[in-house]
Every structure is written in structure tokens, then in C-alpha cells.
Amino acid sequence: MATSILGEEPRFGTTPLAMLAATCNKIGNTSPLSSLPESSAFAKGGFHPWKRSSSSCSLGSSLGGFAVATSRASGALTGGTATANSAFCLASTSPTSSAFSSDYSGLFSSASGVSPQESAGQSAFISKVHASAEGLYPRVGMAHPYESWYKSGFHSDVSGGASAWWDVHAAGPSTWLEVQNTQGALHSGAAAHGQLGAYSPDFSSLTHSAFSSTGASHLLPGGQHLLTQDAFKPVLPSYPDSGGPMLSGAAGTGAGGTGRSARRYSGRATCDCPNCQEAERLGPAGASLRRKGLHSCHIPGCGKVYGKTSHLKAHLRWHTGERPFVCNWLFCGKRFTRSDELQRHLRTHTGEKRFACPVCNKRFMRSDHLSKHIKTHNGGGGGGKKGSDSDTDASNLETPRSESPELIMEGVRPGKDSGNDS
């Protein structure tokens, strides 16, 4: 047997790789008595990585790491007639040998001089051993931290293992964002980009930055993926679709409504006074009420009528006691119901006297004071009307008083609230 062994290839019994393989084989052996002949015979035979063994390696109970080991035939231990051959196998080693597993892991894929048939057989054998080894540890998703690197030649799936949060490459098809679906995500991103581009060009940079990051989004766990196409659906409504009917409806209203009443009363009533509510209730039959343009006070016992809704609102403030107009003169701060009352009050601060007597050229701040003065010249003649006209000219045109003859209904006493001075 020694002659046949010496006649073969050069010996590698003294190399560190052979010593490591012998140690691994010694630990993997079940009989402690056969370890010494095995190591001595292996030292004589050498380590031949290009030959294949006829027996497989036994798998121990502790799997600290994987190393390259050699297996001897059982006949070489007793008879000594069979030649010693070596092959690749995965043997269980001590935890200290796991440091050498990554160094010699390249021999799985870069062994020189291996025929296609032998390489196919070796890969099938290794995949079977690896599947049985992973079955012992169903709780661990990966047998080694760098398993995805040195297992480039074959792939095995752990059926009972739960993938950890860092196990990105082993994610199943149940995850909603995968690396393989990058093209689909980019396609959906382009569709959303087209929809947003039709609305406004300001969203183009947003969609580009959001969907261009999907290539790197697989590095995040499943709970951290926040930018999806569904997230944009409830946020951005379809403005172009709803904008078309709105514009067309507005154009149709402008073209169809020729009269002022058609534009004004096309929707709800613009005023809540009794006259407007009655016209709204009658519909087309209330066109006569709309043409009059009269807005009456709804307070019982008042019955005043105004030609503009703004005038009616100013009158209603007198009922409610609201005083929105404030004097901004220093240390004054008085509040008034109407703007003309505020203007008349400001003349008391400035000392302006707008109304002059046509007889004696005496000037007055208020028109009613001028009216009383003219009565002294005429002996109580028709000076009152002149003072009333002057007061009307002095008042603000935005909120005219209700003493206008054409807006007063019968039975309403004129000048009811005209003589109050604030």
C-alpha cells in the first residue's frame, strides 16, 4: 500500500491545509480508536482536491462552521488494498474552526481541473448536506452571516425559518416591495408622474425623487417603506377632470343668463330678508319681487325697506347693537353702527364745519344744526328740507339712510333714526 501511495501524486501531508483537514476528519469520526490510523494514513496519502471520494462525510451534532475535509474509504483502514481518494464534503468542526471556513470557501466554486460531471455531482451533494444542516436550526434564517456570498453556486430555501429584519435577499413574495419588482414600481411611478404632470409642473420633481429612490428602498425593512403609489391617490384629487365641467358650466352660465336676475338668483338667495325668501320660494313667479329690488327688515314692528343688501345689513346692526366702526382718534375709541356716524363724529375732533348758512355765512358741523339756524331767518319756513338735503350730502354714500322717499313704505315714519348723535 505504501508503494502505491508513493507512486501517486506528490505528498501534501505537511501542508497546513492537510493538517486542518485531518483534524476535521478526526473530529467527524465516530470511533476514537480509528482516528490515529486515519490521520497517519492521510499523512501518507496526501490531500488531493481534484479527486472524488467514494463515501460521504458524517455530520456531527455541533455545527459551528463549515470547512473542507477529506473522507477515506473504510477499506483503506483495514485491508489497505484500495487507493485513497479525497473529495469535498462538509464536516462538523469545533467553533474554533469557523474562522477558517470563509478562507477556504472559495474552493466550492474555483476548484481547478474539475470536469462538468464531477462539479455537478459535488454541487448536488453539497446542497443536500446544507439543506439537512439548515433543518437542524429552523430558528436561524441564515447559517452563516456571509452565506449569500460563498453560496453563489447553489441556492436553498429554509422552509421553517423566519426571516430576520436584515435578511433582505431572502424576503418572500409576500412582501409588497421587492428588488425584483423594481421595474414595476418604476412603471407605476411613471404613470403617477404623468397624472401629476397634467396638473402642475411643480410636482414633477417630487415624483421623480420619490420614485427614483425605489432602487435603494429595498435596503429598508417592510415597515419603513412609506412612499408608494397608493399614498398619492387620496392626497392629490383629479383636478383636471373636475376643472373641465366647472369651466364649461361657468361659460354656459355667462352665455345663457342674459338678465341680471338670472345671474344673481341662479343659485340660492343672496339675501335672507323676507322679500328675498318669498321670491326664492315662488321661483319664476317671483320675478316681479326680484325686479323691485326691495329688502325689508324682518324684525317685527320695524318694516323698513332698503334698496341694497348692504344698507339692510347696516340697519340690522342697529337692532343687534353691533358697532364695528371704531374711532381711532387718540384716547377716544368710540364705536358706531354706521360709517357715516363715524365720519360725523370725526368732525368733532377736527373742528371741521361743512355747512354754512346762505344768509349770514355762519358755519355748522351738522346739517340739522344748520336747519334750525335757517328757521330763525325764515321764521320757521321751508328751511328744514334744505338742511335734510345737506345732511344727505354729508352722509356716506355706501350706507345711505332709509329716509329716501322712493324706499319708504307707507306707514313708516321718515327720519325715525336720523337725528341721533353719537
Swiss-Prot record:
Origin organism lineage: Eukaryota, Metazoa, Chordata, Craniata, Vertebrata
CDD domains assigned: SP9_N (cd22549)
A GO-annotated cellular component: nucleus
Physiological role: Transcription factor which plays a key role in limb development. Positively regulates FGF8 expression in the apical ectodermal ridge (AER) and contributes to limb outgrowth in embryos.
SUPFAM superfamilies documented for this protein: beta-beta-alpha zinc fingers
Predominant location: nucleus
Annotated source species: Xenopus tropicalis (Western clawed frog)
InterPro entries in UniProt: Znf_C2H2_sf, Znf_C2H2_type
Family assignment from sequence similarity: Belongs to the Sp1 C2H2-type zinc-finger protein family.
Pfam family for this entry, one: zf-C2H2
Name of the featured protein: Transcription factor Sp9
Domain comment (free text): The 9aaTAD motif is a transactivation domain present in a large number of yeast and animal transcription factors. In SP9, the motif is inactive.
Coiled coil: none
Motif stretch (9aaTAD): 163-171
Domain of life: Eukaryota
Location of region: Disordered: 372-422
PANTHER family per UniProt: KRUEPPEL-LIKE TRANSCRIPTION FACTOR (PTHR23235), TRANSCRIPTION FACTOR SP9 (PTHR23235:SF26)
